[in-house]
Amino acid sequence: MSINAVDSKKLVEALLGDLRLLSQEAKKKQNHVKEAAESGVVRIRNISTASVGDTVLITNLRAACTELLHPLVLSCETRHTRLVQIALQGIQRLVQHRILSQNGATIVTNELWSLVEAECEELRVLQTVPPLVSSELIVTGNTLAKCIVMCFRLHFAKDPIVINAASAAVRQLVSTVFERVIQEDGIFSTELTVVNPSGGRPSPRAAPPTLRPCAADAYMLFKDLCLLINGEAPIWLVGIQETTRTLGLELLESLLKGFPSVFIRHTEFGDLLKDDVCPLIIRLFSPNVKAMHISSQHPSSRTSNASFNNYPPTISHERQSFPISMRLVRIVTLIVQFYQTILHTECEIFISTLLKFVDGDRKGWQRPLALESLHRIVSSTDLVKWMTESFDCRPNSTHVLEQVAIGLSTVVQQCLVCTTFSSDQENEIDRSQEDGGPGFLSKGLWVPYVEHLTSKKTILLDSLDRMDAVAIPEGYVLSRCCVALCDMTQAVYAAIDKLCLVDENSEAGSSETKLEIAKVAYANSQPSILAAIGSLLAASTDEIVSDQLLCCLSTLISAGCRVGADADLHRSVYVLAIMSLPSPSYLNQFAGIAPPSPANKRDAPVSEQVFDLEAWPSTTQVTASGPPCPCPVVSTELWNKQVLLTSKNLQAARTFIASITTHIKELNNLWYLCMATCEHLSWLLAMRPTQVGQFERETRDDHSNVPTVVTNAALSDIAMLSSLMDKVAPAIAALPDKSFLSVIDALIRLSDESLAVAATGRESSLFPLAVLYKVCSLSLMRLQVFWQKAANHFIKVCNHTSVSMRDWAAVALTSLAKHAVKSKTSMDAKSQQEMIISSLLALCSIPHIQVRRRQLDCVMSLMQTDGAFLLSTSWPNVIQIISAIIDSDTECELSLVRQGYLGLRLVSSDFLQSIPFDCISGLVEAISRYSKQNTDQNISLSALTLLWTISDFIYRKMESVGNDASEAVWMVLYTCLSESCVDSRFAVRKSACQTLLQTVTAHGHALRSAAWHSVIWQIMIPLLDKVRSQTRCASTEKSNGELIMHHSRDTEQKQWTETCIHTISAISKIFNSQRKSLLALNDFGAVWEAFLGYLDWAACYENAELSLSAIRSYQEVLLGKISSQTLNVNSHEKSNGSDSTIDAITPELPQAQWVESWKVWLRISRGLARQGCAAMANSVNADSKSISSTPRMNSSSSSLASLAPGIYVPGPSHLTAILHVFPPLFDKVAKSITVDDLKYESLPAVLESMMNVPIPSEQAPFVLPSATTHLTPTQEALLEAVKIVFVECTLSGTSLRAAIPDQIRLLLKFASMATQRISPNKVAPGGQKSYRDYALTTIVPFSEYSLRIAIEFFTSTSQNPEVANSLIAIDIIKFLGEPLYMKYTCISASTWKLAATSLMSVLRTSIPYARQNPEVFRGLWSAICDTMERWLFTPNKSTRLAADERKRDELMECQAIEIIRSEMLAYASRLPQEDVQRLIALLHRGSISQIDSTDVLDSHTQRNELAKACFDALLMSSDGAHTNTEEDEGRGILGNVAVTSLLQRCTQVMSDFCKDWSAAGDLRLPRSRILEIISALQAVDSLIARLARDPKMTELYSHLVSLFPSVVDVMPCCHADPQLEHQLIKTIKSYQTLFLLQNIPQATVE
């Protein structure tokens, strides 16, 4: 050991310190010590100074060891306490830093011995000796012995502290001695060769010469320990005066336990064990050994050996025997564990001794002590293996392993036997049960269980500090046996497992030898262990203990499987099986399964060997009760007997199922036993298998006579058992073929037993079927191995009388078939499918419905999931299975029909390509059967759809099969469909018609031309005739069927109407899709006319749906498209809008057919209008008081609140739909019709009558205007039609221009709806809001829009002679007079304003042309005067308006006055005189204020601007008072009239103003009055100025002079306004000019 620089320096300083301290302490009395210490100080300093390095320093100190020890030894010799302490401290430093040499060690040892002898500083001596010995090999031989003796002697000192320290020192020194041996062996790997001295044997008092020094010391030490234990004097440890046997045994045990390599490597030590230790132990075990107190001393001592042999006893033999025996047992255990290879016979003796202790317990602690030792032995795998190899496998040797197992088993049996039983014991049992503690209960004997026992955790073997045995807990022996047996079982299994492992490097034949050893180990231990475990398990009351025992039992089964011990395995499995069931005799009594024969024929059966039938415990918690599973081999009287299943049974059941699952490959002939046990378990726990082979708890059992009762406590266990049972089938599926078939046979045997039970009417177990199904489903890869056997059994069960068994078998067979079809096997696909499907086909002979249902389910599943894998040869069987449902006696079973049809539909939809074409006819026939059956109408309907699918398939196959073959199938298909078209059931009839017509539509082009003539005249047209006839003749009585039908289909007539609708629609599609083929027919015209005649009838039929459908079909057949207009009355569409129509090309059609279609359109439109008007008339006659049924001009403003039953009114949707046909149809026929077709009596009358059709009240709330045009769809369509006609009439070169006025008149008719008077009690259609609100949103926008279009049409064509000469302008002006007259009383103010602007537009357009043709337009001027008068002077006054609104309205009137002035009065000479007079009178009337000047409340009705405009017009018209030419003569006449009217107006204004001024007093007159009089004064100025320019106007001069007084009258009032005053002054000044002209009249006269 190297010492670093720091340690060396510290050592020098510490030594110097110790020496100085010695010098200081010894200077008074111990002068020689002082001098020696000082010399030592000097010596250390010199060494330290002279040493260059640390290593040299240590070396020099070690060389001077004797000199350094001198002062320390002198100090010890003084026996002075303080000096001795300091000296021992220094010695310890030298020992610690290994400064001592071997001589120095001897000196120190001798001095320490002297201190011990003197009893001086014993504790410090003990602190010094162990480091001295253990530091280096400087203490050997006698010196070492001396050190050990010192510690032994101090072990018996008086001070307890010293005793304890000495005890520890002894143990340390003894261990150190043997550790030296291990170190020595590591240093010297070769053997030490020693030559014996010549002439004699080695001395017995010395170590063998073959040992090295350390080994020799250890040898002598161990030998002396044996001598001391045996009470003899030691040889090497001279000086030991006394010791104890317990200490010696403990030291012996520590050496045996800690250093087994020393004893095994060195034969000398092995000889010591064999010659000294074992005989010593045997002698001490002997009952003749008496307790002795060893007080030996050194042989040289005075007491000599006599004291050894004659020691007085100090303690009792009883007390002395336990610690000795306990230590002996510990040593024995160690010897067996570590030295069995070198002490073969001795170990056998020791084990036998322990077994004897176990067999009889005379002292109360011997049996548990021996059991603890045996427990440690049997829990070792290596020891079990050694016992088997060394003893049990040898023929003439004692079977030690067997004896140990028997011994433990015997103890168990003895502990469970109660010799006496008292009431106190019974009370104790009750208390223990109440406390819930674990334990064992057998025949009234309660043995508690001591928990947490292991082989290492013991009570007696660990009592090293006790002189007496501790109190043994009650039940300790049985508990220790229980744990020992469990551990032994595990050790046996581990040993077997190790022996059975295949070692590739092992020699040939060694594997067989090992296997034989394993078999012997199992055979010798299994019977006893099984018996003991069974007894303990039966008596156990604790779940954890039972679980341990069950685990042990499972391990026995695993070991038996490993070695292939069939008989022993059978017994183990049987024991576990009967533990899982209510009683040991259950299998024999209720299942007819006899127990296995015992190993010895003279022994009782296993069930009686292991279990005491009378002592079978009943205190375990009962979890289930009920009758046993019925078995046909036992008496039926036992079927109703009640049995109890306990929680322990469930525990065992878990272990049982887990064990058989784990070791299923090794069970061989035990399949029936295992499966029967599982069957009875599942029955007793009411665990019923599910349809997929899983097990679950059944909530109730209604079929059993005595129901099974399962407590809630068992539910969790049942769930676990279910999970475990589910794992059995996968384990079976992994077996090889031979074992697999054995399991199948066992399950079939159990199933046959269940069938026999079910035949008696009792419920039987489904367990065999479930497991058989599950096993087969997991083994489909070897289908050929089991299919025939399993399938035949399932088919057999399918024909059984038991419903549940039958259903289960059907489920199993069909499920297997579904999975087997796609499984990969060694068979070819054809053979595999034939084998599987033939099994399914065999089920057709079974009449039971549920079996056939399962059969069909399977076929469906096969087609759905694996249809692609079905070969062509399999399809005939598949179709035959499906068809057999209708052919068999079960054809009336609804569920089967439905299920069969599903399969048929699947074939038709997904697998037509897989079916050979020659099978299509059979498929069609099968579908036809399903369509004709009366069980389920829905299936009949759906079957017709399948024919449509087949038609597609036939079409696709035409190229490959040829036209002849395909047309033959077509005709068969059409024949089948035509038969269904006349079915009495409405739905079937409807579906058949649709299918037939859709098929023709889709695939009709596949027919050749010759076939089409027959299709039309033999199928289509007759079908239409028949449908029409049936519709007319159908009953209108409501159906009394059980089904609740919608009101729209609750009569036969309604149903036939629906059929008619679908027929029309379908044939229309045929005419479009097959137009090219039909046009090729020679009689296409007749075909077209016949079909349009049918559409004409249907469109005008008194049914809304049929009528609308016919109109849409009419549109489709003409245009190849359908408008978006349906029964949704709010659908808007433009004829030229591509976004609102279905993109389609107009079908080709000859012009003659287009004209025919035009005529049909007119007939349909008239018919719809006629029906609406007739309904209106009927409604009025039925209820003249009904306000909502009063006729109106337009459908937008009229509705029918109530109709008589059966009265039909075409709705807006019908009108809109037929109007949507008009634009494209008119475009086709416009060049082929005459103008008479567009005159008012023709097309406009039709359109007007359509607007007269009332809205049914139920539809009115849903007729909503467009968000953009604010028009309803019908209104938009009508106006669109008028626009299209107008555009056509305006084209150049057209002959239809004369029809333009008729179109304008029609629009005026539409516009007149806005001028209707609204009565207070008038209600809107539908009655949801007021009529005014309804009119504002629906009527007014349409009327105004019509008026705008009419004005637009007129203004754009007014110059055309046809339009102008029609005098349509007069009609327009007259019409406009009505809204202008109504003015503010119109529904909407926008109406009269639109009329005003329209009037001005018409006047500007028509007046210039009328002036050029006065004779033609003579009636125009009076119409204008009438309209203007009605407008300007209407009595319909407005409510208060805002100022800006009033100004805007007045401005329009002023604009009209301006037009009259500029366009009419300016050309008065060309107008009739009476009309001019009316116009002047209008202007005069308009210029007069018509309000009371004192009435300020009506001041808002003043029209000052109008009055001013009229006044200005009069004024300007007065310019024509003097003319020369003929044209001016007329204007002069107008001027004179105007002047007269103007002067009258001025006079009146000034007079009224003065009068009102006087009456107003201090109040100012309105500003308008002031402006009015200013205007009058300005007019006087203007007339004076005009007279100055033309002085010849004498009449004007007279009028002006007459007016002057009125002007002067205004002067008092002129101060009212500065402007008025200024104007008055100016006017008076103007009279100067008039006065200057006073002679003009004379001049004129001259």
UniProtKB/Swiss-Prot annotation:
Per UniProt, the keywords (alphabetical) are: Golgi apparatus, Protein transport, Transport
Give a single Pfam family match. Answer: Mon2_C
Compartments, record wording: Golgi apparatus
Q: What's one GO-annotated cellular component?
A: Golgi apparatus
| UniProt-listed InterPro entries | ARM-type_fold, DCB_dom, Mon2/Sec7/BIG1-like_HUS, Mon2_C
Q: What is its main location?
A: Golgi
One GO BP annotation is: protein transport
Q: What does this protein do?
A: May be required for traffic between late Golgi and early endosomes.
Instruction: Family membership, please give it.
Output: Belongs to the MON2 family.
Query: What is the protein's name according to its record?
Result: Monensin-resistant homolog 2
